Each structure stands twice: as C-alpha cells, then as structure tokens.
Amino acid sequence: SVCRILEGCWNYSFIMGSKYGGTRSGTQWNQSFWSKEKASNFARKKDISELDYLEVDQNLLPWDDQADGAIQDAQDDVREILKRPILNLQGMSNADIKLNYGIANFEILSACDQNYTRLIRALNQWGEALYQSEKLADAESIFSYALDIGSDISSTYITLGKIYAQTDRIEQIQPLIERVKKQDFFMRDTVIDKLTGIVRSYQ
C-alpha cells in the first residue's frame, strides 16, 4: 500500500541521514532497524486464519440503488472492496508484519491492509458525495461507521463535525475532539484545530 511505500522511503532517508550525520542515536537506530529487518526475513509462517479481519454489516450503510454520479461511483467502489479480505494493520511496520506472521504471509497481509486503506478512502468519498448532495443523515452514518472501524482520514472527522454543527448538535463535537486526541496520525493536530474552529464559529 501507499503506507508501506512511504515507510520504505522514510526508513531510507532516516538511514542516510544517520549515515552522513554521524550521530550515535542514528547509528544505534540503524543497527536496530537492520537487525529487526534481517530477523523478519527468516520468520516462519504462522496461522493467520484467526486474525481480526473486518466483517462489514452492510445493513449499516445507506445504499441507494437510485443514486448516480459521485454517490454511485463511491458505492460501487465500496461494494467491490468488500468482496476482498480486509485487515487493519495500521501501526505495524513491514518488519513487524513479517516477524509476527512470517515472511510467507507478508504479501497477502499487505494486500489485506491495502484493502483496508482503500475502504476507508472509499467511505470518505461516499460520505463527502452525500454531504455535497445535502444528504446529511446518510453522510453522518458513513462517517460514523468509518471512524468506528478506525479511519484516520482527516476530512472524515472534519466533515462529521460540520454535520453536527449544521444540525445543531454542536455538543457532539467535543467528544469527537477527545476521540481525535487519543489517536496517533499525521494530521491529528490539524483535525483538532479544524474541529475547534467549527465550535468557535457556531458560538
């Protein structure tokens, strides 16, 4: 997935920076990284049948057979993704996956993780399309479900906050902010600022 590619780029830049910077902490990190990476490439295959694969109750999603345009496209994307095995491995590095489940399972688990990333993106696109069409209740159900399965997409949080404000439920934004504070993703502080701004604008 994109996350896996970015991880590799980050690891490379960190290692190169450590190499030419000559810091002790960088050298230690470099040694630790390669030691873990080497060990992971010899990890034995393990049973992955009992992992917490995502099972989506499709009755929770506001399907609309009469939809067209962006809404229909997003629905179709979600339907297609739900035909595949989905697993949220956010927070695990490539080496972590191989060490925990064996290098022989790495390709299939990476695909499952990529399916998860595709799903939360498709759900966000679906929710945004519904929001733009002023179908706020349906958009809210999509965004809420996406967060329940662990989405870290910033616009999922922010647009849900906008819906709360537009439907005079501003008090529900603070719990949403507290939820964001417990997460660890790149745009966390930006999301908190945006949600706080929505509250201030409402008052």
What are these regions (language model features)?
Residues 129-130, 164, 199:
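Residue at a conserved register position within TPR or TPR-like alpha-solenoid repeats
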Residues 155-156, 189-191:
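TPR alpha-solenoid repeat register
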Residues 2-120, 201-203:
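N-terminal alpha-helical interaction modules that lie
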